[in-house]
Amino acid sequence: MPISCKSQCGNRAVLKRPKTGDALCKECFFAAFEAEIHHTISSSNLFRLGEKVAVAASGGKDSTVLAHVLKLLNERHNYGLELVLLSIDEGITGYRDDSLETVKQNRDDYQMPLKILSYEELYGWTMDRIVAQIGRSNNCTFCGVFRRQALDRGAKLLGVDSIATGHNADDIAETVLMNVLRGDTARLRRCTSIRTGGGEDTIPRVKPLKYSYEKEIVMYAHYKKLVYFSTECVFAPNAYRGHARAFLKDLEKVRPSVIMDIIYSGEQLRFKDTVKKPERGTCIRCGFVSSQQPCKACVLLEGLNRGLPKLGIGKKSKGERMIAKQDQELALRERAHLVKNDF
């Protein structure tokens, strides 16, 4: 027997919402999904009239749905935003080169200007070359650090007021779990924040999809027939996040509300005053936001350029010893060369 839509619109239900368990027709699901995102935006005051907003676009389901919904809500509710797409090309053959074609399709479909920045032009390296140097054990560290700074660089170049990212509820719950498991109180403090950054020298980042389930984002993209790139990064299987994701999926089978439960728990966490909070400033080398001197991106880049790819991995003191050792070896070689030339 057909199930009727719970909203009593008279239509037949075609799906069951993972977030609420409600049986809905397509149109009522669209309305509920979009209304929840609008509520998140308006209740958190994510945007102001007349702002220029960069949508971090990867071509995946999250950023594609984010671009689609922001354009729709901007017109429906008169946000008065100027929306642009900002995409980062990490230089991953067979992955990013293909996904950028989807981003270009998004540009045409949503009539938004698109800016693409590459690791090659920003840092002189691609992820393919970095992985060839470092191997697959720490590649996500390099990519994550460089990507975060690349978005800041792109946002500054475009002169935007904020960056909207496609982080969804599952992503945030995974991050809470990761930071708990690692004992990373600094990141645990801010990982559930819907807005981060925005200080004197930083461009804020906002998460309009913070309370949107990944499964519902996939459903929305499917029923709306949105074009998105679904292939996983070829280097992603080795990421630590994958273990947190698998753990979260197991918990969700037992308790469907666990995603929102973890997010709410993260929001309510309080830390003792004695817990040290890292001070954020600007890097003495590149001038971008950092909680250390020099910033992580500059340290990692120095390691690559010195032929010491593991320089920025692990404790700072270890990296300093690696630099000192290399400098000493270079000095000895130079001295030996000078002595040889004297004869």
UniProtKB/Swiss-Prot annotation:
InterPro entries: CTU1-like_ATP-bd, CTU1_C, Ncs6/Tuc1/Ctu1, Rossmann-like_a/b/a_fold, TilS/TtcA_N, tRNA_thiolation_TtcA_Ctu1, TtuA-like_LIM_N, UPF0021_CS. One of its GO terms (cellular component) is cytosolic tRNA wobble base thiouridylase complex. It is found in: Cytoplasm. Its EC number is 2.7.7.-. The keyword tRNA-binding applies. Keywords: Cytoplasm, RNA-binding, Transferase, tRNA processing, tRNA-binding. GO terms for biological process: protein urmylation; tRNA thio-modification; tRNA wobble position uridine thiolation; tRNA wobble uridine modification. Transmembrane segments: none annotated. Pfam families: ATP_bind_3, TtuA_LIM_N, zn-ribbon_14. GO terms for molecular function: nucleotidyltransferase activity; tRNA binding. It is an enzyme of class 2 (transferase). Pathway: tRNA modification; 5-methoxycarbonylmethyl-2-thiouridine-tRNA biosynthesis. Belongs to the TtcA family. CTU1/NCS6/ATPBD3 subfamily. Plays a central role in 2-thiolation of mcm(5)S(2)U at tRNA wobble positions of tRNA(Lys), tRNA(Glu) and tRNA(Gln). Directly binds tRNAs and probably acts by catalyzing adenylation of tRNAs, an intermediate required for 2-thiolation. It is unclear whether it acts as a sulfurtransferase that transfers sulfur from thiocarboxylated URM1 onto the uridine of tRNAs at wobble position. NCBIfam families: TIGR00269 family protein (TIGR00269). This is Cytoplasmic tRNA 2-thiolation protein 1. It comes from Drosophila yakuba (Fruit fly).
